[in-house]
Curated annotation (Swiss-Prot):
Database matches in SMART domains: GuKc
Record lineage: Bacteria, Bacillati, Mycoplasmatota, Mollicutes, Acholeplasmatales
Location in the cell: Cytoplasm
Record key words, sorted: ATP-binding, Cytoplasm, Kinase, Nucleotide-binding, Transferase
Organism annotation: Onion yellows phytoplasma (strain OY-M)
Predominant place of localization: cytoplasm
A Pfam entry, by short name: Guanylate_kin
Function field: Essential for recycling GMP and indirectly, cGMP.
Protein name (record): Guanylate kinase
Gene: gmk
GO molecular function: ATP binding; guanylate kinase activity
InterPro entries, per the entry: GK/Ca_channel_bsu (IPR008145), Guanylate_kin-like_dom (IPR008144), Guanylate_kinase (IPR017665), Guanylate_kinase_CS (IPR020590), P-loop_NTPase (IPR027417)
Length: 212
């Protein structure tokens, strides 16, 4: 019996401005677990401090649309006149290596991804402690005009109604607390019966007790 350990695909999603990147970065700093971040692609301009290939793959509209034609994205969506997408190959490679792959994507992208029913995928919806916090965070960025902030808030109001379709909801009241909750979720997912049995059978196999 040959069993390969495969990692979880952890989809961290939520409205724009909820703090997905901040929580994910804090989580990576808090643990030495086998986490990798799947860098998304976008056609929007980099924000201050963002690096190409680290925070996003920044593409032109033409480059992104060519990627769509060539089926290079696991999921993609258009949001406030910009494309966002998840390159497919890097995720496949990471999961085969048994790594825990973090996706940090918009709600529309998560909706498309859920329809693919990829095994070992965990969907986490990040929400602010109150709606005003979302506006304050978007305003604090200093990169959005008031009209765009209004569009993002209106979209967020619709997205909140999709929270029940996720496996977990995490409130981002304090970054460290939110990161702790996600770590607890991942531990709980690994403790689920199906995954525990898979790991137990692997231990038996390694010790010569595998089925003949």
């Amino acid at each position: 019996m040959k069993l390969n350990k495969k990692g979880l695909l952890i989809v961290l999603s939520g409205p724009s401005g909820v703090g997905k990147a901040t929580v994910r970065k804090a989580l990576f700093e808090m643990t030495n677990h086998n986490f990798v971040y799947s860098v998304s692609a976008t056609t929007r301009k980099p924000r201050p401090g963002e690096q190409d290939g680290k925070d996003y793959h920044f593409l032109t509209k033409e480059e992104f649309e060519k990627g769509i034609e060539n089926n290079c994205f696991l999921e993609w969506a258009k949001f406030i006149d910009h494309y966002y997408g998840t390159p497919k190959k890097q995720i496949q490679d990471f999961l085969k290596q048994g790594k825990e792959v973090f996706l940090e994507i918009e709600v529309e992208g998560a909706t498309h991804l859920r329809k693919k029913r990829i095994p070992n995928t965990v969907f986490i919806f990040l929400v602010p402690p109150e709606k005003k916090a979302l506006y304050d965070r978007l305003k604090k960025r200093g990169t959005e005009q008031e009209a765009n902030i209004a569009k993002r808030i209106a979209k967020a109001n619709n997205e909140f109604h999709l929270a029940h379709k996720y496996d977990y909801i995490v409130v981002n009241d304090e970054v460290a607390n939110a990161a702790d909750r996600i770590i607890a979720i991942i531990r709980a997912e690994h403790a689920k019966t199906k995954r525990s049995i898979r790991n137990y059978l692997k231990i038996l196999e390694d010790n010569g007790y595998a089925e003949q």
